[in-house]
């Protein structure tokens, strides 16, 4: 049996030889570029703990700073992007209590800055969600251009198009995005390409403003 698992996020060029799982089975894994070829045929048994979804968690963390109420998030994956996002949020004045590796308590009632330090933002691409969250709640945000991505050229023009449609003024200079508006309002937004990230970001920005937004 050959099972090919396509990885859209990681470009891997390595070969993994025989893999033993608790002595109950052996299978051969060969990884070339962006696919894994698994040749089975042996019995496998064991337990695997499935962590929370990283991409969903990043959007939820951004949404958590849009309320002054305490937010408790459980089953967070313990990965770099999540840890950096929590550091970036805490830097703005948000109270972040890391209860354990997979649970965090957030309270943004004392958020005092809409400027996010470059130190955090350039390390993860999903930091752009903070633009939508801060813009939607406080009508301003200053964030470095996001990093942490090597999957070709992935501009955030659709995000900015959505923010502008909601009434935001966008200025990009010296590697930073400045978004602000005296009055945001709902709008009909047509994305030029299908973009999950842009959709989430626009939803964040539109969630607390008057009027209906259609994407």
Can you annotate each of these PLM segments?
Residues 6-7, 136:
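Intrinsically disordered, low-complexity polar segments enriched in Ser/Thr/Pro and acidic
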Residues 7-9, 18:
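Glycine-centered signal
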Residues 14-215:
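Structural preference for solvent-exposed beta-strand-turn elements
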